[in-house]
A protein has these predicted regions:
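Nucleotide-sugar donor-binding/catalytic module of glycosyltransferases
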Residues: 1-155
């Protein structure tokens, strides 16, 4: 499984993000950190992170936005499944194990989960009440994206 993280000027938060990915209960991960032309010290930090864990690869590109960074990750990913995490996010320790197991157990091509948005002032949850992932094939997922009815984290 490949986890793709687009990164732009995120030296203040990307370490927490990557630590949460590397601490997953599912350990057969490839983590692709895509530096999207950062102008701060992000790239140096990403290279230090990669030097400590062989599962991490750093790719660089000129700034082109999150979609082009994700596409570069997809072009270089080795996994059979792909997950996307933003550089300012952290993930639950079993997130990818739960999502991947759900896909494999049901033959689904896509699994989405909710998310919690937290700040010092508030917390917002967009998770299903039973905590299970949403499962669908690619056509259902694309229709949901087009109509705006699908949101959350996915593999």
């Amino acid at each position: 499984m490949s986890v793709i993280v687009p990164v732009y000027n995120a030296e203040h938060c990307v370490s927490d993000c990557v630590e949460s990915i590397l601490a997953q209960t599912y350990v057969n991960l490839e983590v692709l950190l895509i530096d999207d032309g950062s102008t701060d010290n992000t790239l140096d930090l990403l290279n230090r992170i990669a030097s400590k864990d062989s599962r991490v690869r750093v790719l660089t590109k000129h700034n082109g936005g999150v979609s082009s960074a994700r596409n570069l990750g997809l072009d270089n990913a080795l996994g059979d499944f792909f997950g996307f995490v933003d550089a300012d996010d952290t993930v639950e320790p079993d997130m990818f194990e739960v999502l991947l197991s759900a896909c494999l157990d049901t033959g689904s091509e896509v699994a989405c989960c909710g998310f919690n948005r937290e700040s010092r002032e508030s917390r917002f949850s967009a998770c299903r009440k039973d905590g299970t992932p949403s499962l669908m094939n690619r056509e259902e997922f694309l229709l949901g994206v087009i109509t705006g009815s699908k949101d959350g984290r996915l593999i």
